[in-house]
């Protein structure tokens, strides 16, 4: 009982001596925060989950939500970049410096107390190395004088004396450092005795310092045993080749100069796959193409063109009248740029092929619908390099392109017919001139006649004199009635009168021409007409008794109806 009473009395005295409120009041705000964090670590709240017990130890405020995937990707990129830098870095420590690394390891093992011995060994090794070099030089240079050897020995002695003095100074400094360290240790012990709560903080600090020193030692121990020339060589694989990645040898400045000068020998401008071409130069090329009249093909595939270049191309197509093929595939043009280009195609009648597939961004459904709508105003585009996602615009654009191809084919056929008629009339003129026939005699003798629909094409101009071949058939009759006075007509006029009478009995060709025109008009009308839909037969349906009854009721008469007694239930 006496021992228990003594312990209780000691506890009361200790509690009276250590007042917690006074201690907490004397602490600074920083010390209070540290004490709170230590208490949370020592005695965490059991009601909190494990993830909430360990708080963040960073002062920086969070910039966003935690994303594990992005963190892993960032760590992977850091590791890859560090590895690449280590492979590309030229080594600093070579094989010849193994002695220094061994000495550093020995110093790390011995500690701070053996520093003077290590310095002495290092100085002695340097002195021996210098002596060996001097001996080697003496052996190679035998013709040197003894005076020079004596001077070298004196210099070596002086160096040794200076090194010894340096060692003494270092020892004195180390002694002073040791005394300061002892003083700091004593002060720390006194602080720990007065404030037992700070003991744990000091322990953690010393642990961190030991870890840092071990890491620095490990970094110092790293070395490269052998030199690998492949690793020492500069690796240019990570560098982006800025000249011509795909082998396009186009001279940009020269090509731009030729485009501006409107060179007639330049029919194609190919800038494909020149990835590092400046945007300003691209705009210069497009603006120079506005007034060019000779380039037929303009290619800008995979050059990094964006919407500004697309708008410039739209303005170029509005003014240019020579480009037939435009290729802008594999760029960064969005739906707005493509729609602007398609909107300006209604003012262009020479472009036949447009390619804008494989863009960085999707055009979108609205842009595809707008493209199909704007293409209706263009009648010359024959090919389009793009795959539509929606089936509606795809079918509309396909039908419009087939329409343009049909118009192109019809125009080509008309040109061929005109060319054939020209050749036919030239042949008739050559025959009449070669045989000495009067004008119109070839037709009277049953020669081939041109198509009457093309008479307007061969009518003479108002200010030009009329030739014999260009005179219409009605005027030819008048010429035959009142022929000019050539020598042949004067010698034998009766023969022409006979031929004239014979020709009068035959049918004139004017109504034939009219009939042909009427036929052509009928053909055009027939083309515009639509076929009459056939009356489809009614579907075959089996007649039921109910249908028969209803049919009989419809076609029956009241006079033929028989009276029927009501059933008993209805009565």
UniProtKB/Swiss-Prot annotation:
The keyword Metal-binding does not apply. Its main location: cytoplasm. GO terms for biological process: actin nucleation; pointed-end actin filament capping; positive regulation of skeletal muscle fiber development; skeletal muscle fiber development; skeletal muscle thin filament assembly; striated muscle contraction. Residues 545-564 form the WH2 domain. Residues 397-436 form a coiled coil. Residues 10-23, 142-179 have a biased composition (Acidic residues). The keyword Coiled coil applies. Skeletal muscle and heart-specific (at protein level). Residues 94-105, 193-204 have a biased composition (Polar residues). Residues 119-134, 180-192, 206-228 have a biased composition (Basic and acidic residues). Keywords: Actin-binding, Coiled coil, Cytoplasm, Cytoskeleton, Ubl conjugation. One of its GO terms (cellular component) is M band. It comes from the Eukaryota. Induction: Expression is regulated by SRF and MEF2. Ubiquitinated, leading to its degradation. Interaction with KLHL40 negatively regulates ubiquitination and degradation. May interact with tropomyosin alpha (TPM1/2) N-terminus. Interacts with KLHL40; leading to stabilization. Belongs to the tropomodulin family. This is Leiomodin-3.
């Amino acid at each position: 009982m006496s021992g228990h009473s003594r312990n209780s009395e000691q506890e009361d005295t200790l509690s009276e001596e250590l007042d917690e409120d006074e201690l907490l009041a004397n602490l600074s705000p920083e010390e209070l925060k540290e004490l709170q964090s230590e208490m949370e670590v020592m005695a965490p709240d059991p009601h909190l989950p494990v993830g909430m017990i360990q708080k963040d130890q960073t002062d920086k405020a969070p910039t966003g939500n935690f994303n594990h995937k992005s963190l892993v990707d960032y760590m992977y990129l850091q590791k890859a970049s560090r590895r690449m830098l280590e492979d590309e870095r030229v080594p600093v420590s070579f094989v010849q410096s193994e002695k220094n690394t061994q000495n550093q390891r020995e110093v790390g093992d011995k500690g701070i107390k053996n520093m003077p011995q290590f310095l002495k060994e290092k100085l002695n090794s340097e002195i021996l190395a210098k002596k060996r070099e001097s001996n080697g030089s003496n052996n190679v240079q035998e013709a040197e004088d003894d005076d020079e050897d004596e001077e070298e020995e004196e210099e070596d002695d002086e160096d040794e004396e200076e090194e010894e003095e340096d060692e003494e100074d270092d020892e004195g400094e180390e002694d002073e450092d040791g005394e300061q360290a002892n003083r700091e240790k004593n002060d720390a012990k006194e602080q720990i005795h007065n404030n037992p709560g700070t003991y744990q903080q000091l322990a953690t600090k010393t642990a961190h310092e030991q870890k840092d020193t071990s890491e620095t030692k490990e970094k110092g121990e790293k070395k490269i045993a052998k030199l690998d020339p492949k690793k020492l060589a500069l690796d240019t694989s990570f560098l982006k080749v800025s000249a011509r990645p795909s082998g396009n040898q186009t001279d940009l400045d020269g090509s731009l100069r030729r485009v501006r000068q409107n060179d007639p020998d330049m029919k194609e401008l190919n800038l494909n796959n020149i990835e590092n071409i400046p945007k300003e130069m691209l705009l210069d090329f497009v603006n120079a193409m506005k007034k060019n009249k000779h380039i037929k093909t303009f290619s800008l595939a995979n050059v990094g063109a964006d919407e500004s270049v697309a708008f410039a191309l739209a303005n170029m197509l509005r003014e240019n009248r020579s480009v037939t093929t435009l290729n802008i595939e594999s760029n960064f043009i969005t739906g707005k740029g493509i729609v602007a280009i398609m909107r300006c195609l209604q003012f262009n009648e020479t472009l036949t092929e447009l390619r804008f597939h494989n863009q960085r961004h999707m055009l979108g459904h609205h842009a595809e619908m707008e493209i199909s709508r704007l293409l209706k105003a263009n009648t010359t585009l024959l090919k389009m390099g793009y795959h539509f996602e929606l089936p509606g615009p795809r079918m509309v654009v396909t039908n419009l392109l087939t329409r343009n191809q049909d118009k192109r084919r019809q125009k080509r056929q008309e040109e061929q017919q005109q060319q054939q008629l020209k050749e036919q009339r030239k042949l008739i003129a050559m025959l009449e001139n070669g045989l000495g026939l009067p004008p119109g005699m070839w037709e009277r003798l049953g020669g081939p006649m041109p198509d009457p629909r093309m008479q307007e094409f061969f009518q003479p101009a108002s200010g030009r004199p009329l030739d014999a071949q260009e005179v219409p058939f009605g005027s030819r009759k008048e010429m035959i009635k009142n022929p000019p006075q050539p020598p042949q007509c004067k010698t034998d006029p009766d023969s022409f009168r006979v031929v004239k009478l014979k020709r009068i009995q035959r049918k004139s060709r004017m109504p034939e021409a009219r009939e042909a025109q009427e036929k052509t008009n009928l053909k055009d009308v027939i083309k515009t007409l639509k076929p009459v839909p056939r009356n489809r037969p009614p579907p075959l349906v089996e007649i039921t008794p109910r249908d028969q009854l209803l049919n009989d009721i419809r076609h029956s008469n009241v006079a033929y109806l028989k009276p029927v007694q009501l059933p008993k239930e209805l009565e």
